[in-house]
Swiss-Prot record:
Expressed by the venom gland. SUPFAM superfamilies: C-type lectin-like. Interferes with one step of hemostasis (modulation of platelet aggregation, or coagulation cascade, for example). It comes from Macrovipera lebetinus. This is Snaclec B6. Heterodimer; disulfide-linked. Residues 9-120 form the C-type lectin domain.
Length: 125
């Protein structure tokens, strides 16, 4: 089971943090919150819908960091947890990524700005 203050969805635990951090600081924070924790990886429209329902009522904010980043600055985007990037929802927009909490769109943002974020980890066994 997920910790009491995290939400469960399809084998993962999620928590919205009403803190503003840079992408790096948010990712580090997520790794400290739960074993195997990272910024959220959105792999399907169902997972995006779940994140929107979870995040928007808490944050009333438009954008959250997600775990997608251009790690090698070569325009090759990859999920922080190394999952395959099969599902995509890009708008046309620098090296880190945010998702809108009001609809299904992703944007690139400079990694050093502060945003709210959602952490994700596997359900502990």
């Amino acid at each position: 089971d997920c910790p009491w203050d995290w939400s469960s969805h399809e084998g993962h635990c999620y928590k919205v943090f009403k803190l503003r951090k840079t992408w790096e600081d948010a990712e580090k924070f997520c790794t400290e919150q739960a074993r195997g924790g990272h910024l959220i990886s959105l792999k399907s429209t169902e997972e995006v819908d779940f994140m929107i329902k979870l995040a928007y009522p808490i944050l009333k904010a438009n954008l959250v960091w997600i775990g997608l980043r251009d790690f090698w600055r070569d325009c090759h985007m990859g999920w922080r947890d190394h999952a395959n990037l099969l599902y995509k929802a890009w708008s046309d927009e620098p090296n880190c990524s945010v998702a809108k909490t009001t609809d299904n769109q992703w944007f690139r943002r400079k990694c050093n700005i502060s945003q709210y974020f959602v952490c994700q980890s596997r359900v502990p066994r």
